[in-house]
Amino acid sequence: MIDLITQLIRPDIRALSAYHVPDPAGLIKLDAMENPYGWPDTLKAEWLEGMHDLALNRYPDPQGTAVQAALRQAMGIPSDMGLLLGNGSDELIQMLAIAVAQPGRKVLSLDPGFVMYRMIACFAGMDYVGVPLRSDDFSIDLPVMLDAIEREQPALIYLAYPNNPTGNRFDSDDMVRIIEAAPGLVIVD
C-alpha cells in the first residue's frame, strides 16, 4: 500500500502536514472569526423557523442569486461588478489558485501569514513565496515586498487583513503600492 501511495501521490503533497487546530480550551480564540458565545435563543428560533421553507432535499442555487442581491443592496455593489461566493475563505482561496495555476506560476504572501495560502498553492501545483514581515512590529517591509514582486512576478498575491496570525492591520498606502506593483491578482482576505 505504501508503494501505491508513493506512486500516486505527488511528493510535495506527501510532504505536507495536516492543518492542525490546537484545542482552544482555556484560551480566548480570536483567529477563526468565530463567535465565542452561543446564539441567543430568539435568534436560534428565528433561524430554525426559516429552515421550514427550505428545500433541503435539493442543491441550493449555485449562484447564490438572493445572497448576491442582498450583498449588492447592503454594500452598494454595482450590478456590473462580479461577485464570487464560496463556502468560506479556504474554498475561495483554492478556486482562485486553481484558476491561475500553470507550471512556473507563483503565489506570494506575507510570513507569518495564513497557513492555507502556502498549503493551497501546493495543492494547485504553484510555487509559494513567503515575504517576511518586519520582526519588530509585524508590519510590511515594503522595499522587500516590492522587490519580491518584481523578482518573482506572482500570478496571485494574498494579503490577510487583519493579518492572521499576528492580528495587525497593514498600512493602507503600503497595500496600494503592492496592488499597483502586482503583475497578477491581489486578494485582500
From Swiss-Prot:
Cofactor: pyridoxal 5'-phosphate
Aminoacyl-tRNA synthetase in keyword set: no
Superkingdom assignment: Bacteria
Keywords: Amino-acid biosynthesis, Aminotransferase, Histidine biosynthesis, Pyridoxal phosphate, Transferase
UniProt cross-references to SUPFAM superfamilies, sorted A to Z: PLP-dependent transferases (SSF53383)
GO biological-process terms attached to the record: L-histidine biosynthetic process
Keyword flag Ribonucleoprotein: no
Enzyme Commission code: 2.6.1.9
Segments traversing the membrane: none
Enzyme class: transferase
Reaction(s) catalysed by this chain's protein: L-histidinol phosphate + 2-oxoglutarate = 3-(imidazol-4-yl)-2-oxopropyl phosphate + L-glutamate
Gene Ontology MF: a single term: pyridoxal phosphate binding
Family under the similarity heading: Belongs to the class-II pyridoxal-phosphate-dependent aminotransferase family. Histidinol-phosphate aminotransferase subfamily.
Known partners and oligomeric status: Homodimer.
UniProt protein name: Histidinol-phosphate aminotransferase
Taxonomic lineage: Bacteria, Pseudomonadati, Pseudomonadota, Gammaproteobacteria, Chromatiales
Gene: hisC
